[in-house]
Amino acid sequence: METGSPGKRPVLPKRARLLVTAGMGMLALLLFGPRLVDIYVDWLWFGEVGFRSVWITVLLTRLAIVAAVALVVAGIVLAALLLAYRSRPFFVPDEPQRDPVAPLRSAVMRRPRLFGWGIAVTLGVVCGLIASFDWVKVQLFVHGGTFGIVDPEFGYDIGFFVFDLPFYRSVLNWLFVAVVLAFLASLLTHYLFGGLRLTTGRGMLTQAARVQLAVFAGAVVLLKAVAYWLDRYELLSSGRKEPTFTGAGYTDIHAELPAKLVLVAIAVLCAVSFFTAIFLRDLRIPAMAAALLVLSAILVGGLWPLLMEQFSVRPNAADVERPYIQRNIEATREAYRIGGDWVQYRSYPGIGTKQPRDVPVDVTTIAKVRLLDPHILSRTFTQQQQLKNFFSFAEILDIDRYRIDGELQDYIVGVRELSPKSLTGNQTDWINKHTVYTHGNGFVAAPANRVNAAARGAENISDSNSGYPIYAVSDIASLGSGRQVIPVEQPRVYYGEVIAQADPDYAIVGGAPGSAPREYDTDTSKYTYTGAGGVSIGNWFNRTVFATKVAQHKFLFSREIGSESKVLIHRDPKERVQRVAPWLTTDDNPYPVVVNGRIVWIVDAYTTLDTYPYAQRSSLEGPVTSPTGIVRQGKQVSYVRNSVKATVDAYDGTVTLFQFDRDDPVLRTWMRAFPGTVKSEDQIPDELRAHFRYPEDLFEVQRSLLAKYHVDEPREFFTTNAFWSVPSDPTNNANATQPPFYVLVGDQQSAQPSFRLASAMVGYNREFLSAYISAHSDPANYGKLTVLELPTDTLTQGPQQIQNSMISDTRVASERTLLERSNRIHYGNLLSLPIADGGVLYVEPLYTERISTSPSSSTFPQLSRVLVSVREPRTEGGVRVGYAPTLAESLDQVFGPGTGRVATARGGDAASAPPPGAGGPAPPQAVPPPRTTQPPAAPPRGPDVPPATVAELRETLADLRAVLDRLEKAIDAAETPGG
């Protein structure tokens, strides 16, 4: 029965065609609509922040890569398909009913162009899209320069290895992909059309199929020869000897490197043998050549280096690896700036020889000892300075310094941000959440070396109003009062770490012209945002786009949105910097500062490389846990520079990038790629520069490397005997390493306060102190590292040993039992400070937090005790422990009377009065004002008095105390009823 005219294609009815067209349109909209919306929003946002040129450059680079790779891959694959199709044989299978590919062949024959072009273009576009992620390599290759340093093996400039070689490898990989795809396409096409037939006995190839497949197979092998050639250069970043060292070792240079040349020659011969199949019908020659290449790769490329490593290198590793370890040491020091030009080493005995009060440097250090721990006091800040339930502080506060009345003082600082997660009830309504509760309020700081009053007693210590920070508040309320210790002219915070935790993260500000303010400012005032930040949604098109992006129809129908409305997005300071400078790696800890009356976030940014020859690999970022629970290591780098300091204005979100390392060739490359995006170092305001801190992420990498790379002699490096270790955190049960700490210490030359990031180091697999590393943050000496090296046979205890000694002290243990009855105990930063002309002072604040008996009650930590410890001058590792409510009393216990006065001489210690204009805990959330007067600071030290006179005065004082005791007893007896 006939169903239609022979050869006539069926035609869909008009209605069916319309439905199919509409369905395909809807599918395309679903697939590409969200991406188009994202592109348009990015266009608007990058224009708002003034970095649209970055977005355009990245987009054009990626599009160029897509076009180039797609064109090459599609062209090669299409050529392969076309050649195979045009050279197909005219054959009819002996048994057509058993031909498995007959239906597919018929379908292809009906639309050969569609299949050919469709397959080629699809493969090309997919490959192009994947390759577009290599845009960084392309930009580095195009704009890369030189380092002025050559590698020790080939004599090439380092720029070749970090700018050129990755690009060459990427190009080679995509050519390899294109040729392999073309080979597979040729193979399948010839099989489909009979050029390749598989019978029960043997396979059969037509001459055209043999020639085409041989050419593509030869091209694959030829590309493999090029890959072997490039492998030679990549040996300089070999990981064969890790974790001992990174880079080419003896085996790599004397076995792998020659093996690569041998394999290059064999691969070229193998490729030639494949090309001979064009003229020779015998395929045994290319088959034998391919077998030779595989066998050579196993024997020459694998077995030979393995045997050399096992039987020649390992038995004599210390000697044969010596020159290569030396290369690794020199390259690592250069790549991470831990060489002699940046690190100053000093011998340090570890035992004090003088009283701290007699050493000018120590007088400064003791007066500035930090007692407040930013990791512990966030909840205290929140409870006492929250004001409203929807305000909060970051989980970890920050440390910075300010010069108040000519005196440099370090502060624990935080921004009172809006916390979207804390909104409750009707506050979470869309209108309230996104148009009313839009910003935070104020900058809060507390001097890091003192609290409002010393906590006395142990039974009810949490009920006392003591041990709390002395707040210097700069917010809306204090703006007009003139009581700001740190003046802030614009205290409103629209951009921050906490405020950006909303999902989705956006706030809608502004409205119709002349409309009443609606943003919550204070209990008695509303506010309308006037900053430059934000993307306009005053027109219906933009409103529709954002409604689509966040899947919220209220963008279209809300009367709160007018012609002057804007939406604030990407409000996390770190994220903003990452988006405008995707070629930078940002530090994990942005911190707020006040500059010229404005709250500004400072974000440290790094230029990094992962192919610096011979440089040790390190993890710049901590482990990352995926949503599925898989933990992977952070970004591995072999070169890092803190080349950029970025700022984000907390009010209008303005992002500014400042050059901070003129000598960094990587930054110079990126500045050529994105001209005008990074301001020169000369444009950094002095007030901003004064708040730059040495970044923690960089310091942690450098200290872990200095633990090994302070060793100069390769043989000693190989034995690891002189290595150090980062100590474990004695206050953390998670077995984490001790975090570095910011401190103000006395400068060795001037005795003036110097802001530094520091860390103790212990011996390799030992607990005794081996070194003390500090990084300068002061503008004049920024970036210089100082390493105090203790003798190798030192008995100076390290952090863990000191912690054990302090908590096992009888006074500490006995009072701890009392404190734990109704409190949780938190140990703060264990600070290690050089002191006493060769000694080390350990200081650790102890916080207590009342155990809550009611779910509705809130508790928060307070400073209760101060522990200090120093090594005994004339004992084999013995220590003195001080334990008291104040630092002054603790110091007197370990150094004798008089040292404690140094701690209060400049307003330090637990019982110091607040500075003028500083606010105590603010009501109603704050703790009430102290009920008792605070003890005055100790008087300044007078002239020296002879010891005999001191003894006589002490005896007289003792007699007077005895008389007073008897007098009090007599009074008590007289007042006792019936007495």
Curated annotation (Swiss-Prot):
UniProt-listed Pfam families: UPF0182
Record keyword Cytoplasm present: no
Region Disordered, annotated ranges: 898-948
One GO cellular component term noted in the UniProt record for this chain: extracellular region
Recorded topology in the membrane: Multi-pass membrane protein
Domain of life, per lineage: Bacteria
Keywords: Cell membrane, Membrane, Transmembrane, Transmembrane helix
Localization per Swiss-Prot or TrEMBL: Cell membrane
Biased composition (Pro residues): 913-946
Ranges annotated as spanning the membrane: 19-41, 63-85, 114-136, 174-196, 208-230, 261-280, 285-307
PANTHER family, per the entry: UPF0182 PROTEIN SLL1060
Annotated family: Belongs to the UPF0182 family.
Record's protein name: UPF0182 protein Rv0064
Species whose genome carries this gene: Mycobacterium tuberculosis (strain ATCC 25618 / H37Rv)
